[in-house]
Each structure stands twice: as C-alpha cells, then as structure tokens.
Regions:
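Secretory targeting and sorting signals
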Residues: 1-32
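Extracellular attachment/recognition segments
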Residues: 32-146
Length: 146
C-alpha cells in the first residue's frame, strides 16, 4: 500500500505542476498593438526632428530617403517588443518620436546601417495613469543602401 500511495502522490504532484506550468506560460493577453502606416516617400513633410539628421530648409524628405511609420499602443506596466524594418534596398539612419510622446523605446541592438531593429517599448508613468494605455507614433528614417 505504501508504494501505491507514494506513486499516486508523485503522479498527482506531477499533474498539478504541469497544469500550473501551462497556466503560467499562457499568461494574460498582451494589450500592446502595433500598426504600420504607409511609408513616407520623397517630397513628404518630415514629421519629427530626427536626431543626427539635418533637415532641409523646406522640411521635405529628400530623394533616396524613406520614413517608416509605426503606430504603437502599450498598456502601462507592459514591456512589449517589436521589429521595425526599412523597405528593401534601404538601411536605417535614426529613429524618432514626437515631442511629449506617452510611449518610449530602446533599441536592443546597434541598428545604424542595418535594415531592421528590435525595439522594446515602455510607457511614461508620469503621462499614463494606472490601467490605461499610452499611444505613440514611432518614425524610422532610412536611406537608400549604396
């Protein structure tokens, strides 16, 4: 009897652990959404002041440049990640946000001169209340690869 009760106890413990592990892996659904907008072409007005890029006097995008636009919506306390990719034949130059954005990001790798970058996003807790979502538009300036 001792062996069977031990065996039953071990099997039931393993089953409970498996169920709890599956529930932990499932987690809650992410509230983060990312929506890619159309790529801005030459002649379009440059929407933000990109760091390290001298905008022309007329504030229009020059030839051989494109701007990738991504709309992000992130819940406070979340740390989602996304990959931004330049159009084929283009390489990333710099990234930008509008002044006063509710969502910020950090690049997980060195992206200058590469076609894509993985970004980890976070919400500014001073601008977004607990339980709310923050909104931002992320801009990626890309230049034609030579």
């Amino acid at each position: 009897m001792t062996l069977t009760s031990r065996l039953r106890r071990t099997v039931s413990l393993a089953a409970i652990t498996a169920v709890a592990g599956t529930a932990a892996l499932a987690g809650t659904a992410s509230a983060a959404t990312f929506e890619k907008a159309p790529v801005l072409q030459p002649g379009a007005t440059i929407p933000v002041d990109f760091p390290g890029y001298k905008e022309p006097a007329n504030n229009k995008l020059k030839a051989n440049y494109r701007i990738v636009v991504v709309q992000a919506e992130v819940a406070r306390g979340e740390r989602p990640s996304t990959i931004i990719t330049a159009p084929k034949g283009f390489k990333l130059v710099t990234l930008g946000l509008r002044e006063g954005a509710e969502v910020g990001f950090r690049a997980d790798n060195d992206y200058v001169g590469k076609r894509s970058v993985r970004l980890t996003l976070g919400v500014n807790p001073n601008k977004v209340a607990q339980g709310q979502t923050g909104h931002a538009t992320i801009y990626a300036l890309a230049r034609r690869a030579s």
